[in-house]
Design a protein with these regions (language model features):
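N-terminal secretory signal peptides that target proteins for export/translocation
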Residues: 1-9
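Sec-dependent signal peptide cleavage junction
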Residues: 24-41
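A glycine-anchored, Pro-Gly-centered beta-turn/N-cap motif
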Residues: 46-48, 52-60, 131, 135, ...
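Beta-sandwich interaction modules
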Residues: 51, 88-104, 134, 165-184, ...
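A short "linker-to-beta-strand initiation" element
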Residues: 116-132
Length: 202
């Protein structure tokens, strides 16, 4: 699923900013719930190469699939993040179902291979069966029951940060049957091939 991607050099500075603004309408930021939309005036960063602090501001971003079909909850987006623009130190290549979340820091190099990015606080994310969610912003903290789409096909993961992902993972499990998960305020939930998620009494 995850593959190494070399940088797509060439979209820097003003060119990246122009591309970002031009893609605002080409790639409307929609969440899993179709009635939710990104805040008006949100800048959208399409496929390309971005140096954080030059081409894109530091901060937390949501990366969405470009698929706008009714089945887009199960479509993917792919990004690669490097520690700097030399590409010598790759943090990782990440693929998300529908959308993922990532924190970007000044000097890092982001390559969006498939999908587009918007500021997470302006992305209008609402809970769904795939993607990533921050408790306290995108969903309510609490206890949830997660049911797989089909037995063994999916997984869930909890993170305390979205900088380097696996260094900050709190919990991970494959979905063979319904599971109950407690999600604390500020934690991040990732869902892949879940069939349903519902709030249950704590």
């Amino acid at each position: 699923m995850v593959r190494c991607i070399k940088g797509l050099k060439g979209i820097k500075g003003a060119g990246a900013l122009i591309l970002a603004f031009s893609l605002t309408f080409a790639y409307p930021a929609v969440s899993w719930a179709v009635e939710t939309e990104a805040s008006e005036g949100t800048v959208t960063y399409g496929p390309g190469s971005y140096v954080v602090g030059e081409d894109i501001l530091p901060g937390e971003y949501a990366v969405f699939t470009e698929d706008t079909s009714e089945q887009n909850a199960y479509s993917t987006c792919t990004i690669t993040l490097y520690k700097d623009d030399t590409d010598a130190r790759r943090i990782g290549t990440f693929q998300f179902q529908h959308h993922g979340l990532i924190s970007l820091y000044k000097g890092q190099h982001l390559v969006i291979t498939k999908g587009y990015a918007v500021e997470a606080d302006r992305a209008g994310i609402t809970p769904g069966t795939t993607g990533m969610y921050k408790a306290g912003r995108d969903m309510e903290p609490g206890t949830y029951r997660i049911t797989p789409l089909t037995s063994g096909s999916g997984y869930y993961a909890l993170y305390n940060d979205v900088r380097y992902y696996y260094d900050y993972i709190d919990e991970y499990a494959a979905l063979f049957e319904p599971v109950t998960v407690n999600i604390a305020n500020g934690q991040y939930l990732e869902l892949f091939d879940a069939g349903s998620i519902e709030r249950v009494p704590d």
